[in-house]
Amino acid sequence: YDIILIDAYRGPFVPFHLLTKEFYQIVKDHLADGGVVAQNVEPSTMLFDSAVKTIASVFPELDFYRADGNIVTVAYAGPTRSAEDLAATARERDAAFGLRYSLSDMLAQRRRIQIDGGKVIDANAKILTDDFAPVETLKNIERHNRKLP
């Protein structure tokens, strides 16, 4: 696939098996070279830290976009495209398709962060696996005094 979209929240929760390293490896195995996977992740709980760290364990290239109080992670199967290339494509698609939401405006919200730096993503966050995925517990523990840049 060129694109896989994951939006599996049921109320405030997401099924734990859709946030594990093994799940993301299966997703990656089904992506074409240069394909992307996008997933909505709520940033206000410790689950965000573990989810991002888990995604990054399979997809080392991640972009982040703000979306109505949530963060959409976009992970790449292969190298990321340059900012200039993405901007040119966004402008072309905006003009060609008259989309409801401007891709150029969304691209302006693009952020990249260092996963291992510990400044935004908690250095103690655990990678979620099929054998260890306390999703509901992490979802219920609020993150304090940190904001996504």
Residue ranges and their predicted role:
Residues 1-5:
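A short acidic, Gly/Pro-enriched loop at the edge of an enzyme's catalytic core
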Residues 9-12, 37:
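A short, flexible beta-alpha/helix-coil linker loop
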Residues 10-11, 42-46:
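Short "lid" loop at the C-terminus of a central beta-strand within the Rossmann-like core
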Residues 12-19:
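Glycine/threonine-rich flexible loop motifs
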Residues 19-33:
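A short glycine-rich, Lys/Arg-flanked "PGG" loop and its adjoining helix->strand segment in the class I
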Residues 24, 48-69:
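Conserved Class I S-adenosyl-L-methionine
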Residues 34-41:
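Conserved beta-strand signature within the Rossmann-like core of class I S-adenosyl-L-methionine
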Residues 63-149:
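Soluble small-group transferase modules, centered on the S-adenosyl donor enzyme superfamily
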